[in-house]
Amino acid sequence: MKLFHISHTDLDGYGCQLITKEYFKEGFFYNANYGLEVKLSIKKVLEQVLEYKEDEIIILISDLNLTFQEAKDLDNDVDKLLKNGYKIKLQLLDHHISGKKSAETFPWYYLDDKRCATKIVYDYMFEEYEGFDCNTSDWLKPLVDAINAVDIWLENEVKNFEFGKVLMSMIIKVREINNILFADLNRDFRCYLLKQAAKYLDEVDGHIKLDNDVHFMKKDFLKLSNKDDTLDNLSATYLVKTLVDVKDDLTVIYKGHKGLLTYCLGSISIPANAFLRANPEYD
């Protein structure tokens, strides 16, 4: 089965993808905010599925409410693929009430405003598939409950709500890996942090301990050796390594000079100089 999963760009959206990554292990993942990003992500998925006519395909959209026109267009596009012999299951799982009209019109559009999307996706894994074993559920279910508490604002669930607030802040502040140029790595980074954060759920004042340790969790992910360094330096070294991995795709030649064309990278001076030192063939 080939999974294509589009989700939102916040804690709830990445929580959904942590779940599908744990279950399916591999797939094609995209994150989008509303408007044009959603349209482009859907367009990309519909182009990619053309390569997998012999496979069973699931297109999952989570924590994103489509406009009625977007839902209608997607329904028509998938229907055409089905008539051409593709084996596609389309499913949208969301909790935003603004999608009510679409949910009442299209059977694949599931809406429940009493649960966040992460919790809906988690339950869906048990309803439609085999769910998770006890070892995974033991850490994943409490994490889902914390995300649910903060996303739909359940202040009465004090422990989950406070923990969820730290999770939300942690995910918002992931800036060490660019989410445009390195979307997959950025997503993996966020999912890593969420999975590590789950270890604090059973601790006394776990939300405070997690808040204190996020800095060190980031450093552990970014370290390419056992040598410790500042977070900025580790980020720069990691960025240089990722740029080297894709430098052939980003290289430009102009008037005999060799350069690297990057985009959407802020605070570039430190990693740029580190890249040039490590790759002297570039001007």
Language-model-detected regions and their locations in the chain:
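Hydrophobic, aromatic-enriched interface-forming segments
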Residues: 144-247
